[in-house]
Amino acid sequence: MTKKVVTITLNPALDLTGSVNQLNVGSVSLVGQSSLHAAGKGVNVAKVLSELGAQVTVTGFLGRDNQELFCQLFEQLGVQDAFIRIAGATRINVKLVEQSGAVSDINFPGIQVTEADIEAFEATLQRLAQDHDYFVLAGSLPQGISPQRCAGWIAQLRSMNKKVLFDSSRDALLAGLDAKPWLIKPNDEELSQWCGRELTTLTDCQQAAAELAQKQIENIVISMGAEGVMWLHENQWLHAKPPKMQVVSTVGAGDTLVAGLCWGHMQRMEKESLLRFATALSALAVTQVGVGLGDREQLNTLQQQIQVSALYPTMGA
């Protein structure tokens, strides 16, 4: 077992989150509660892992001009800060959460990364690889980093026998898949984009995941919202279905799932227990505003309500 893990956030963001009754596109929407906090997929994963008890080192690229909220968060969590500071300001992303639970994301492109910044990051990655086995690479890419370069880092870590959990989308996901990360966690929408067809049922998702398995990725985890989580490992399929949850916000639920999967593997949980734990953690996340562990007692109760079942391979799987 290990408690040490590195989370990599290449394109972090300050999330400006606001709650609205209903988003009026092309008109005025009045925001009720609002918050501005340090985020980015890898940062969110780090927060949950830290609260679970992991010894987390965070790295990636941070703009010098507005790093204060990140520094405060890292200090509060007690994580090791190995972010590369670069010129400019980290982007601000806007998330509007409607009363129905629907979330509209307005994501900006991110800061410009130079070749010198990249060299500093690569040196940090090499150093961290000396005494860490688990790496979570999550989120989008900033300007200046190509999907192929990102995939090269995955391949490099893999060649050193490191376990890379990779959670991204679009071109970064496509390139990263070819580097054979140890675990990937696309949601059903990202899986649909990858295979180029609509996925409306559990069987559809299972068939697409089976096609993805041909890329020889050891762990393929598909998050499907209220339908739960599907995991393909060593030709075995498991499906975890949570009870119906009162959705407050889906922001960070996928990142929480990644953190749960990572922690479960680090703690060498048995497969069904691991999937039950990670699914419960993610299901609990949608009942709260903000990313974090929430109520431990509620988590334990929810784990007992998660149904985990084996799935049979689909035709062609």
Curated annotation (Swiss-Prot):
Query: Which is a Gene Ontology cellular component entry for this protein?
Result: cytosol
Give GO terms: molecular function aspect only: 1-phosphofructokinase activity; ATP binding; phosphofructokinase activity
Q: Which reaction does it catalyse?
A: beta-D-fructose 1-phosphate + ATP = beta-D-fructose 1,6-bisphosphate + ADP + H(+)
**In the UniProt entry, which residues are flagged as the active site?**
D255
Keywords, sorted A to Z:
ATP-binding, Kinase, Nucleotide-binding, Transferase
Q: Which Gene3D superfamilies match?
A: 3.40.1190.20
Residue positions binding ATP: S223, M224, G225, A226, E227, G228, G254, D255
Which PROSITE patterns does the protein's record reference? PFKB_KINASES_1 (PS00583)
Top-rank taxon, per record: Bacteria
InterPro entries, alphabetized: 1-PFruKinase, Carboh/pur_kinase_PfkB_CS, PfkB_dom, Ribokinase-like, Tagatose/fructose_Pkinase
* Xref: NCBIfam families: 1-PFK (TIGR03168), pfkB (TIGR03828)
**What's its job?**
Catalyzes the ATP-dependent phosphorylation of fructose-l-phosphate to fructose-l,6-bisphosphate.
What name has this protein been given in UniProt?
A: 1-phosphofructokinase
Q: What is the lineage of its organism?
A: Bacteria, Pseudomonadati, Pseudomonadota, Gammaproteobacteria, Vibrionales
